Swiss-Prot record:
Dimer of alpha and beta chains. A typical microtubule is a hollow water-filled tube with an outer diameter of 25 nm and an inner diameter of 15 nM. Alpha-beta heterodimers associate head-to-tail to form protofilaments running lengthwise along the microtubule wall with the beta-tubulin subunit facing the microtubule plus end conferring a structural polarity. Microtubules usually have 13 protofilaments but different protofilament numbers can be found in some organisms and specialized cells. It comes from Strongylocentrotus purpuratus (Purple sea urchin). GTP binds at residues 49, 71. This is Tubulin beta chain. Transmembrane segments: none annotated. Residues 265-292 are annotated as: Disordered.
């Protein structure tokens, strides 16, 4: 960060899940990581093993998903996010543009990615999808790569990246359509908070696809889940000696925990915010930052 202050720091961070757990101390590692990510990155795509598993089970009907299958989903999403950098398109967006459009408050830069159409590794889709189908699938909770239900929160901002040959007019109509039908799920104090980019070149094996990036307050569910697991272990100081033995301090854990809980309450605060109260919020925010 010191060396390259003007670079956009972008991470794809895998959030642990109890369903597919390699190590017992995942909640510790995740919490300590979030503590760093909140301060040091510009955009973080939260990819959740739990959600990836659910997608493999439910949507792709895989009975025993391997890491290969999970990675297939992750790579589809990552490729979608960086499409605009790599290919020519009508409406191009780079990472900086994404960051500018997606992050209304510097700490709240944890996005849930989604992808449509979801295909398993072997079977590429045989039928061409229409733009309405893509849009509908893209906003579907089952397609989110983070195990949170967007219906439990509100979108601060959304970016959609469509790939393939399609009519721009249709894309715009569909995106407006989604916003009008579900207006309660988009915060009203950020107008036009859905950005669309279209790129001509679809991913291999598909005619068209869409990548979804949502900055939703529902992502707090994910942090709450980790926080609960963290607290359960930290209360009893379980496994702490592995960390303290490496020269870490218990204080760091406490700080990381409270930082993550602050993040959750910040998301909640903006979820409940309405346009009228906006003035009050600005003052509170400034006070908070000075205190921090």
């Amino acid at each position: 960060r010191e060396e390259y202050p003007d670079r956009i720091m972008n991470t794809f961070s895998v959030v642990p899940s109890p369903k597919v757990s390699d190590t017992v101390v995942e909640p510790y590692n995740a919490t300590l990581s979030v503590h760093q990510l909140v301060e040091n990155t510009d955009e973080t795509y939260c990819i959740d093993n739990e959600a990836l598993y659910d997608i493999c089970f439910r949507t792709l009907k895989l009975t025993t998903p391997t890491y290969g299958d999970l990675n297939h989903l992750v790579s589809a999403t990552m490729s979608g996010v960086t499409t605009c950098l790599r290919f020519p398109g009508q409406l191009n967006a780079d990472l900086r543009k994404l960051a500018v459009n997606m992050v209304p408050f510097p700490r709240l830069h944890f996005f849930m990615p989604g992808f449509a159409p979801l295909t398993s590794r072997g079977s590429q889709q045989y039928r061409a999808l229409t733009v309405p189908e893509l849009t509908q699938q893209m906003f579907d909770a089952k397609n989110m790569m983070a195990a949170c239900d967007p219906r439990h929160g509100r979108y601060l901002t959304v970016a959609a990246i469509f790939r393939g040959r399609m009519s721009m007019k249709e894309v715009d109509e569909q995106m407006l359509n989604v916003q009008n039908k579900n207006s309660s799920y988009f915060v009203e104090w950020i107008p036009n908070n859905v950005k669309t980019a279209v790129c001509d070149i679809p991913p291999r094996g598909l005619k068209m696809s869409a990548t979804f990036i949502g900055n939703s307050t529902a992502i707090q569910e994910l942090f709450k889940r980790i926080s609960e697991q963290f607290t359960a272990m930290f209360r009893r100081k379980a496994f702490l000696h592995w960390y303290t033995g490496e020269g870490m301090d218990e204080m760091e854990f406490t700080e990381a925990e409270s930082n993550m809980n602050d993040l959750v309450s910040e998301y909640q605060q903006y979820q409940d915010a309405t346009a009228e109260e906006e003035g009050e919020f600005d003052e509170e925010e400034e006070g908070d930052e000075e205190a921090a």
